[in-house]
Amino acid sequence: MDPVTALRQIAYYKDRSRQDPKRVMAYRRAADIIEGLDDAARERHGQADSWQSLPGIGPKTAKVISQAWSGREPDALVELRSAATDLGGGEVRAALRGDLHLHSNWSDGSAPIDEMMATAAELGHEYCALTDHSPRLTIANGLSPERLRKQLDVIDGLRDKFARCAS
Protein backbone atom coordinates (compact mmCIF):
# COMPACT_ATOMS: atom_id res chain seq x y z
CA MET A 1 0.00 0.00 0.00
CA ASP A 2 1.24 3.48 -0.79
CA PRO A 3 2.19 5.26 2.48
CA VAL A 4 0.74 8.58 1.28
CA THR A 5 -2.61 6.94 0.52
CA ALA A 6 -2.60 5.19 3.90
CA LEU A 7 -1.87 8.43 5.77
CA ARG A 8 -4.58 10.34 3.88
CA GLN A 9 -7.13 7.58 4.51
CA ILE A 10 -6.32 7.58 8.21
CA ALA A 11 -6.75 11.37 8.27
CA TYR A 12 -10.11 10.95 6.52
CA TYR A 13 -11.41 8.38 9.03
CA LYS A 14 -10.13 10.40 11.99
CA ASP A 15 -11.78 13.53 10.60
CA ARG A 16 -15.00 11.69 9.84
CA SER A 17 -15.20 10.40 13.41
CA ARG A 18 -14.53 13.92 14.72
CA GLN A 19 -11.22 13.13 16.36
CA ASP A 20 -8.83 15.87 17.44
CA PRO A 21 -8.21 18.11 14.39
CA LYS A 22 -4.53 18.44 15.36
CA ARG A 23 -4.10 14.68 14.99
CA VAL A 24 -5.94 14.72 11.68
CA MET A 25 -3.59 17.45 10.47
CA ALA A 26 -0.55 15.49 11.67
CA TYR A 27 -1.48 12.63 9.33
CA ARG A 28 -2.12 15.05 6.46
CA ARG A 29 1.22 16.79 7.06
CA ALA A 30 3.00 13.44 7.17
CA ALA A 31 1.38 12.50 3.85
CA ASP A 32 2.56 15.79 2.34
CA ILE A 33 6.10 15.19 3.63
CA ILE A 34 6.31 11.67 2.19
CA GLU A 35 4.69 12.78 -1.06
CA GLY A 36 7.37 15.48 -1.36
CA LEU A 37 10.23 12.97 -1.22
CA ASP A 38 11.78 11.80 -4.46
CA ASP A 39 11.95 8.06 -5.17
CA ALA A 40 15.57 7.77 -4.00
CA ALA A 41 14.80 9.39 -0.64
CA ARG A 42 11.76 7.17 -0.14
CA GLU A 43 13.83 4.10 -0.94
CA ARG A 44 16.59 5.21 1.44
CA HIS A 45 14.19 5.84 4.33
CA GLY A 46 12.25 2.66 3.54
CA GLN A 47 15.36 0.47 3.60
CA ALA A 48 16.65 2.05 6.81
CA ASP A 49 13.18 2.38 8.36
CA SER A 50 14.21 5.92 9.26
CA TRP A 51 10.92 7.68 8.60
CA GLN A 52 10.87 9.22 12.06
CA SER A 53 14.11 11.07 11.31
CA LEU A 54 12.11 13.30 8.97
CA PRO A 55 10.84 16.54 10.54
CA GLY A 56 7.10 16.26 11.11
CA ILE A 57 7.01 12.45 11.25
CA GLY A 58 6.27 11.14 14.74
CA PRO A 59 6.14 7.58 16.08
CA LYS A 60 2.52 6.92 15.06
CA THR A 61 2.84 8.25 11.52
CA ALA A 62 6.23 6.52 11.15
CA LYS A 63 4.62 3.20 12.09
CA VAL A 64 1.90 3.70 9.47
CA ILE A 65 4.49 4.58 6.83
CA SER A 66 6.66 1.56 7.72
CA GLN A 67 3.75 -0.85 7.58
CA ALA A 68 2.50 0.55 4.27
CA TRP A 69 6.03 0.62 2.83
CA SER A 70 6.42 -3.08 3.65
CA GLY A 71 3.22 -3.87 1.76
CA ARG A 72 0.95 -4.24 4.77
CA GLU A 73 -2.24 -2.39 5.39
CA PRO A 74 -1.39 -0.29 8.46
CA ASP A 75 -2.92 -1.45 11.74
CA ALA A 76 -4.28 2.04 12.44
CA LEU A 77 -6.13 2.08 9.11
CA VAL A 78 -7.58 -1.40 9.66
CA GLU A 79 -8.78 -0.35 13.11
CA LEU A 80 -10.34 2.91 11.90
CA ARG A 81 -12.07 1.24 8.95
CA SER A 82 -13.54 -1.48 11.15
CA ALA A 83 -14.78 1.10 13.67
CA ALA A 84 -16.35 3.31 10.99
CA THR A 85 -20.10 3.27 11.03
CA ASP A 86 -22.24 3.39 7.93
CA LEU A 87 -23.22 6.99 7.35
CA GLY A 88 -26.54 5.89 5.90
CA GLY A 89 -28.36 7.43 2.99
CA GLY A 90 -26.61 5.21 0.46
CA GLU A 91 -29.44 5.43 -2.04
CA VAL A 92 -29.52 9.22 -1.89
CA ARG A 93 -25.73 9.44 -1.88
CA ALA A 94 -25.55 7.30 -5.03
CA ALA A 95 -27.94 9.68 -6.79
CA LEU A 96 -25.90 12.80 -5.97
CA ARG A 97 -24.05 14.31 -8.90
CA GLY A 98 -22.10 16.89 -6.93
CA ASP A 99 -21.76 19.06 -3.86
CA LEU A 100 -22.62 22.75 -3.74
CA HIS A 101 -21.38 23.63 -0.25
CA LEU A 102 -17.78 22.79 0.65
CA HIS A 103 -15.44 24.50 3.13
CA SER A 104 -11.73 23.76 2.83
CA ASN A 105 -8.91 24.29 5.29
CA TRP A 106 -8.48 27.72 3.72
CA SER A 107 -11.31 28.86 6.03
CA ASP A 108 -13.03 26.71 8.65
CA GLY A 109 -12.98 23.31 6.93
CA SER A 110 -10.47 20.65 7.85
CA ALA A 111 -9.46 19.16 4.49
CA PRO A 112 -7.21 20.59 1.78
CA ILE A 113 -8.85 21.40 -1.55
CA ASP A 114 -6.93 18.74 -3.50
CA GLU A 115 -8.05 15.98 -1.11
CA MET A 116 -11.64 17.19 -1.27
CA MET A 117 -11.61 17.15 -5.06
CA ALA A 118 -9.94 13.73 -5.19
CA THR A 119 -12.62 12.36 -2.86
CA ALA A 120 -15.35 13.99 -4.95
CA ALA A 121 -13.90 12.35 -8.07
CA GLU A 122 -13.78 8.96 -6.30
CA LEU A 123 -17.45 9.42 -5.38
CA GLY A 124 -18.25 10.09 -9.03
CA HIS A 125 -19.21 13.72 -8.51
CA GLU A 126 -19.43 15.80 -11.66
CA TYR A 127 -19.09 19.17 -9.91
CA CYS A 128 -18.26 20.86 -6.62
CA ALA A 129 -18.68 24.40 -5.33
CA LEU A 130 -16.07 25.57 -2.87
CA THR A 131 -17.81 28.00 -0.51
CA ASP A 132 -15.13 29.15 1.92
CA HIS A 133 -16.03 32.16 4.03
CA SER A 134 -15.59 35.81 3.05
CA PRO A 135 -13.22 38.13 4.95
CA ARG A 136 -15.99 39.53 7.15
CA LEU A 137 -16.28 36.23 9.00
CA THR A 138 -12.89 36.47 10.69
CA ILE A 139 -13.75 33.83 13.30
CA ALA A 140 -13.92 31.29 10.44
CA ASN A 141 -10.68 32.49 8.81
CA GLY A 142 -12.55 34.14 5.95
CA LEU A 143 -10.60 34.69 2.75
CA SER A 144 -9.21 38.14 1.99
CA PRO A 145 -9.23 39.20 -1.66
CA GLU A 146 -5.54 38.19 -1.93
CA ARG A 147 -6.14 34.77 -0.41
CA LEU A 148 -9.16 34.28 -2.65
CA ARG A 149 -7.04 35.03 -5.74
CA LYS A 150 -4.45 32.48 -4.56
CA GLN A 151 -7.19 29.95 -3.92
CA LEU A 152 -8.58 30.50 -7.42
CA ASP A 153 -5.13 29.73 -8.84
CA VAL A 154 -5.08 26.48 -6.85
CA ILE A 155 -8.56 25.64 -8.13
CA ASP A 156 -7.51 26.34 -11.73
CA GLY A 157 -4.61 23.90 -11.36
CA LEU A 158 -6.89 21.25 -9.89
CA ARG A 159 -9.49 21.84 -12.58
CA ASP A 160 -6.84 21.02 -15.19
CA LYS A 161 -5.72 17.94 -13.24
CA PHE A 162 -9.20 16.53 -12.75
CA ALA A 163 -10.31 17.37 -16.29
CA ARG A 164 -7.42 15.18 -17.52
CA CYS A 165 -8.53 12.41 -15.13
CA ALA A 166 -12.08 12.56 -16.48
CA SER A 167 -11.03 12.37 -20.13
Question: What are the functions of these language-model segments?
Answer:
Residues 1-92:
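Long, highly charged, low-complexity intrinsically disordered interaction regions
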Residues 75, 79-167:
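An N-terminally biased module of ancient metal coordination in phosphate/nucleic-acid-related enzymes
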